[in-house]
Amino acid sequence: MSIPVPEPLPPDLLQETAATFGLLSASVRLQILWLLASGESDVGTLAEATGQSVATVSHHLAKLKLAGLVRARREGKRQVYFVDDSNIVELVGLAVEHHRGPAEPKTHRARGA
């Protein structure tokens, strides 16, 4: 019995999906999404939680917002950021769980070792 092969993705969808994974390849952006997955937050709180400067976090939030991965709303003088797409929350959670494992860290052998 053969396993069915799915149809190839349309080039534009493939490009957009690759761009999303590219954005998530920066550990700071991944950490920001991880934190926002558990609730909304402002830049200062995210900066403190990530150990990054407010300017750095603002820069990464702008990229995430432009890509549609986070949204923002104004509360008085501050911007509050949040993730309202359950698919993004699930994607980040699945990636984290994929790498979270037993207490012993995984070791990877270098090629040719």
Show which residues each predicted segment covers.
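Functionally engaged cysteine thiol sites
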Residues: 34, 38, 42, 63, ...
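N-terminal helix-turn-helix DNA-binding core of bacterial DNA-binding proteins
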Residues: 11-55, 79-87
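Residues within the DNA-recognition helix of helix-turn-helix
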Residues: 60
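Beta-hairpin "wing" of winged helix-turn-helix
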Residues: 65-75, 82
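Amphipathic alpha-helical dimerization/coiled-coil segments
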Residues: 1-16, 86-113
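Generic alpha-helical secondary structure signal
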Residues: 25, 63, 85, 102-103
